[in-house]
């Protein structure tokens, strides 16, 4: 049962207490402005998540949700590699309306 739980981490949590790189987790915060880069030859995407204290790099290979935008809340599920300070995501969730921020992200931004 424990192995099926995805714990939530902010960028500061990942900096201060990184999980094992073989454990799937959720990381969230705001998509940092001007950090979004797309590979023109593939679906590979790079962006950064910030909690306004620390920032982590995120790589993702796939289509982003329509509501994914810079300076908006996001939760990524995947694996964090502390040696690269990089989060490799296999799922990206974006907020679903203008006023919604996931509770975990809101708490991380406090």
Identify what each model region corresponds to:
Residues 1-110:
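OB-fold and OB-like single-stranded nucleic-acid-recognition modules
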């Amino acid at each position: 049962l424990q192995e099926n739980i995805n714990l939530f981490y902010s960028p500061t949590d990942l900096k201060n207490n990184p999980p094992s790189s073989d454990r799937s987790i959720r990381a969230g915060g705001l998509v940092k402005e001007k950090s979004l880069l797309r590979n023109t030859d593939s679906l590979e995407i790079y962006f950064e998540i910030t909690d306004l204290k620390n920032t982590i790099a995120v790589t993702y290979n796939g289509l982003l949700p329509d509501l994914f935008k810079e300076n908006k809340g996001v939760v990524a599920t995947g694996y964090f590699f502390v040696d690269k300070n990089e989060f490799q995501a296999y799922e990206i969730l974006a907020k679903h309306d203008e006023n919604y921020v996931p509770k975990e992200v809101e708490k991380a931004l406090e």
